[in-house]
Curated annotation (Swiss-Prot):
The lineage of its organism: Bacteria, Pseudomonadati, Pseudomonadota, Alphaproteobacteria, Sphingomonadales. Keywords: 2Fe-2S, Iron, Iron-sulfur, Metal-binding, Monooxygenase, NAD, Oxidoreductase. Optimum pH is 6.0. It comes from Sphingobium sp. (strain NBRC 103272 / SYK-6). Disruption phenotype: Mutant can degrade syringate and vanillate, but not DDVA. It lacks DDVA O demethylation activity. It cannot grow on minimal medium containing DDVA. This is 5,5'-dehydrodivanillate O-demethylase oxygenase subunit. GO terms for molecular function: 2 iron, 2 sulfur cluster binding; iron ion binding; monooxygenase activity. [2Fe-2S] cluster binds at C68, H70, C87, H90. It catalyses: 5,5'-dehydrodivanillate + NADH + O2 + H(+) = 2,2',3-trihydroxy-3'-methoxy-5,5'-dicarboxybiphenyl + formaldehyde + NAD(+) + H2O. Involved in the catabolism of 5,5'-dehydrodivanillate (DDVA), an intermediate in the biodegradation of lignin. Part of a three-component monooxygenase that catalyzes the O-demethylation of DDVA, leading to the formation of 2,2',3-trihydroxy-3'-methoxy-5,5'-dicarboxybiphenyl (OH-DDVA). PANTHER family: BLR4922 PROTEIN, IRON-SULFUR DOMAIN CONTAINING PROTEIN.
Length: 424
């Protein structure tokens, strides 16, 4: 149980808040590169700030205040140029660093005045990696953008899924340190949703949480596993400060503001060895719905089930009403680490998992369950005969578009569908 003050300290992310200042020390995924194949600008809201993400005519990305500092026009309606974004209202232009480089009438009427030198727009660095676009909103110099090894994995079909959820980001991230929910939400509840009354999934017998350089792992033993199983020896990674890596996909929980978050999923499906070599030219990005046509929460897919649990806690979970147990040890570890990191940045120190040395920021390995299967692959026959459901259907989020399913089928060269976990 937390006090109301502690809860606010951990949840709220606006400029100047303790958690907001901490999260601004890290890079966050805010969109996908392929989204800009057909458009040049997109409005985004991040940690309570209204911004516009754009790709200029030179192919460079930028992120700046959504409102022009001249008369507050919407820069999302701006015109991209070779080296920046131009306001469509009066033509003022800004580069990726926020400098005003042109004021057409001012430059003509008073060329020596150089009024443009006195005007700037708020701007943040943007980088592309793994098909994602990443933003850094903290003090400079920016740390390294973590180059996780999975971003360079070969012979896999990748897709990026974005969903906007009406709840605070921390509810999503605390899920990254909660192994017991797999037993009940994804196994037992899924059976009930299928109309089954049993048997239930295997019980958890033992759990552990281990800190490492880039976050924590949760490790578990179920009735059907032992201490030699990768679920215990390797575990799954809670990546600091707001992500999870399961062994074949990333889940990022990006704060839009205090009451809204963006789930950004990056998924890798290893193609059969029969389909190698496979080179994916563009990583599709699609937006996953969270409600059906009747306005009911979607519960058929794994992450949609998670979303229901997070949203159900309220816009900002009232942690003063909690009663934590043994299964929640990881939640406590996470909260204490956030508070320690807030203290560190108040002293001018880097928080946990910041990378400054480019020499070590090269294909950084992560805890990966069933690593051999991911790296070496399986034959199409082995996949068809085996129980690896995630290689035969996209079970993680509802709403995979038909054209993305077709791309996945073409890559895998075996039958694919996008039915959910509940339909299994």
């Amino acid at each position: 149980m937390l006090s109301a003050e502690q809860n606010d300290k951990l949840a709220r992310v606006g400029p100047g808040t303790p958690m907001g200042e901490l999260l601004r020390r890290y890079w966050h995924p805010i969109g996908g590169e392929s989204e800009f194949e057909t458009k040049a600008t997109r409005p985004v809201r991040l940690m309570g700030e209204d911004l516009v993400l754009y790709k200029d005519l030179s192919g460079n990305y930028g992120l700046m205040d959504r409102h022009c500092p001249h008369r507050r026009a919407d820069m999302a309606c701006g015109m991209v140029e070779a080296d920046g974004l131009r306001c469509s209202y009066h033509g003022w232009m800004f580069d990726a660093q926020g400098a005003c480089t042109e004021q057409p009438f001012e430059d003509t009427a008073n060329p020596k005045g150089r009024y443009k030198d006195k005007v700037r727009i708020k701007a943040y660095p943007v980088r592309a990696l793994g098909g994602l676009l990443w933003a850094y909103m903290g003090p400079l110099p920016a740390p390294e953008l973590p180059d996780w090894e999975p971003f360079s994995w070969k012979n896999g079909f990748r897709q990026i899924v974005i969903s906007v959820l009406p709840c605070n980001w921390l509810q999503g991230q605390e899920n990254s340190m909660d192994p017991i929910h797999f037993e009940w939400m994804h196994a037992n509840w899924s059976k009930r949703l299928r109309g089954e009354t049993g048997p239930y999934g295997p019980k958890h017998l033992k759990i552990d949480f281990r800190e490492y350089d880039y976050g924590f792992t949760y490790n578990r033993i179920r009735e059907d596993t032992d201490e030699t199983n990768p679920l215990w020896t390797i575990g799954r990674a809670c990546l600091w400060p707001n992500a999870m890596f399961t062994g074949d996909h990333f889940e990022y929980r990006v704060p839009i503001d205090d009451e809204t978050m963006m789930s950004v999923g990056w998924f890798f499906t290893r193609v059969p060895r029969d389909a190698e070599p496979y080179v994916q030219e563009s990583i599709p990005v699609w937006h996953g719905p969270i409600k059906d046509a009747q306005g009911e929460w979607i519960t058929s897919h794994v992450m949609n089930q998670d979303f229901v649990a997070w949203i159900g806690q309220g816009t900002i979970s009232d942690r003063t009403q909690e009663n934590l147990g043994l299964s929640d040890k990881g939640i406590g570890m996470m909260r204490r680490q956030f508070l320690r990191d807030m203290e560190k940045i108040s002293r001018g120190e880097d928080p946990k998992a910041i990378i400054r040395d480019p020499a070590i920021n090269k294909a950084i390995p992560l805890p990966t369950i069933h690593r051999d299967a991911v790296m070496e692959g399986m034959t199409a026959e082995e996949i068809e005969a085996g129980g690896a459901l995630h290689l035969k259907r996209f079970i993680f989020q509802y709403g995979q578009p038909e054209h993305v399913l077709k791309m996945q089928q073409d890559a895998m060269r075996i039958s694919q569908d996008n039915k959910g976990y509940v339909d299994a």
